[in-house]
């Protein structure tokens, strides 16, 4: 059986809906902002609108997409070019950590200290590591 993960469902070829089993992340939309550290833990069902609204409420901004209905996980893990990119880089450049379930069913926390090699993979191809549950993003 093939498995795919669906977050925001903003895609051009319906890719997240092509598996025999679809893991629907839409209800996982919690955001936890640490205004002092200028970071946010964002669950993978969030869309750009969710992240922008929470960041703005703390007088902060995240590097997000240009369309509010874009899923933040797919956007970030795939690179993520947004309005703030000329100043702060791609969304993936602002990815600090990921928490995911591996294909073996292990719950993993990955950042530059715990596993720099997997964190390198997460920045651009993170969906290949497993099902990303949440991500830690740098805010500005």
Describe every region a protein language model picked out.
Residues 1-6, 12:
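Classical protein tyrosine phosphatase
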Residues 1-3, 25-68, 78-112:
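N-terminal glycine-rich flavin-associated loop
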Residues 11-14, 49-50, 70-73, 139:
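Flexible loop/turn segments at secondary-structure boundaries
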Residues 14-23:
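Glycine-rich loop at the start of a catalytic domain that most often binds anionic cofactors/ligands
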Residues 88, 96-140:
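C-terminal substrate-binding/cap subdomain adjacent to the FAD-binding core in PCMH-type
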